[in-house]
Amino acid sequence: SISSSPILLAKAGILDDRKFCAGLYEEVIDKYEFIPRKNLVRKPIYEDRNLITALGFAYREFAISVARKVGIQCSNEEFKGIIKEDYKDEELIFHTNMDYKEL
């Protein structure tokens, strides 16, 4: 599940006992009690058992992880570009525009 789509997994209860990352605004996470903040990790991509979640900008890393999970041999060089390994937490926290009042 990539970008904001983990919200659907949360609504279905799938994330209740799994760690995950998601491209969701902090305000959205606060608004919806079904999103288990305690399981949210600040990583661009995260794998917990058979579930892979990623932020939208980590689509390359997500594709490589999914390919490997289904048994396709895939090197880190399979796709062009640079993989950034270390992110600061503040780089992975998103807020809505303050001019937008209603979620």
Placement of each model-derived feature along the sequence:
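Active-site-adjacent pocket-lining segments in enzyme domains
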Residues: 4-103
